[in-house]
Amino acid sequence: MARTTDNEHSGHRERMRKKFIENGFDVFETHEALEMFLYYAIPRKDTNPLAHRLLDRYITVGGVCDAPIDELMKEFGLSENAAALLKMLPEMARLYTESKMSHDNIIDYENLGKIFKAKFIGRTNECVALMLGDAKGKMIYFDII
């Protein structure tokens, strides 16, 4: 027999998941989006207070994702898996953005800024990107060196 509860949080994650599936993060407050993202690393704990604390400290989701792993673990009690998941977010965004770019390999000035910008998403250390092209404007090589 199913247990009934008067817990106000009962079904909260499912409601949030449905809200996301129907609308994406456009209808979420920033703390709600972070709270939901944390569900996947912290499956049995209310992640709302943690999302608020992280945003109070780091101001933005970008700030949270750029925070040092050891700091996230020590100061917020995150497991290494939870901290690593946050660090993966910008890296996955970069991979996603790069994969959506035109693959015709023709360099044009209109897209050059977008191409370079995408390559630097999620990078926290100084780095250099090298793009090589031929005389016809075809990209031969583009990567972080």
Which ranges hold each PLM region?
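N-terminal presequences and immediately downstream first alpha-helices
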Residues: 1, 91-94
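Long, highly charged, low-complexity intrinsically disordered interaction regions
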Residues: 1-72
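Conserved phosphate/pyrophosphate-binding and hydrolysis machinery centered on Walker-type P-loop NTPases
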Residues: 27, 76, 106
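A general structural motif at alpha-helix termini
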Residues: 37, 68, 76, 87-90
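Generic beta-strand or strand-like secondary-structure segments
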Residues: 53, 71, 85-88, 115
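Structured, non-catalytic alpha/beta "coupling" segments that mediate domain-domain communication
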Residues: 82, 87-92, 125
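Conserved beta-strand-loop surface patch within small alpha/beta domains used
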Residues: 97-145
